Amino acid sequence: MDALNHVNHTVFIRWMETARMHYFVSCGFTTLLEEEGIGPILAGLKVDYHAPVTFPDAMTIQTTMTRIGNSSFDMGYRIASSARGGDTVATATVYGVVFDYKAGKPTPISDELRSKVLELEASET
């Protein structure tokens, strides 16, 4: 909570991070990181706050891969408030890069990972 009794803006970013980690587990990103040292790294973040959130409330965070490039990707987020009847309280875009942590540089997204992401996206619609 901040001084105005709202959920602080940084909390929204943590919620998105948690949702992103669940997404990455679902498409095999975490296994790739453990086995090959290749994984996602955050390059940028844009958040639009549409309404304040106060305690108590329950949030629903929707996460989707909105773009897959050669070595980069974008993820979209919608955060909805139960107390506000499911209304959107924030939307966001995360800009990420697939990174080879051993080599210290971006690396192309493998066909296997791309297929898993597309499969996950198809199952969510």
Regions found by a protein language model. Name each.
Residues 53-55, 66-125:
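HotDog/MaoC-like acyl-thioester-processing domains
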Residues 1-44, 100-125:
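Hot-dog-fold acyl-thioester-processing enzymes
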Residues 23-74, 87-91, 97:
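Hydrophobic beta-strand-centered segment that forms part of the acyl-chain substrate-binding groove
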